[in-house]
Amino acid sequence: MLIWQEEAWHTTENKIDIVTGDIKEASHIFGNDSYEVIVSNPPYMIGEHGLKNDNEALYIARHEALCTLDDLLRESAKVLKMKGRFYMVHRPFRLPEIFTKMCNYGIEPKRMRLVHPYADKEPNMVLIEGLKGGKPRLAVDPPLIVYTKDGEYTEEVLKLYGMK
């Protein structure tokens, strides 16, 4: 979520705690069954797949160097309360693996939406919602198109960003 208005930012001041730690230890840091919602933008690339950035921080953010999909889902399943929601943005090429692992950890995929940079391009992102302890049933939302053919944000993206 992007916060565009300063007053919106100030209303969240006392509601956010920033904790620094290893995500592989999340259940030890926060305890089991402690959160109703988890939102994640994890590293997308496995090993050396994709372009390697010389900037170590960017490399770690984009590649599963310190945190794998298994690490994220295992700890999320522990930390989420029953019927808690799990949200993630990832790459479509990993969907079969993502759905398999979510189910293996008891987080049922409930909704997905493919994100296309342009209407005539393949999707490059996928938005996923899961439910801990949910029953099998996946809803597929209409695709989200980010840019018009002229390179401007689409009306929907402008609305999502609070710019319309």
Predicted regions and their residues:
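Mobile active-site "lid"/loop adjacent to the S-adenosyl-L-methionine
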Residues: E36-V37, P42-D71
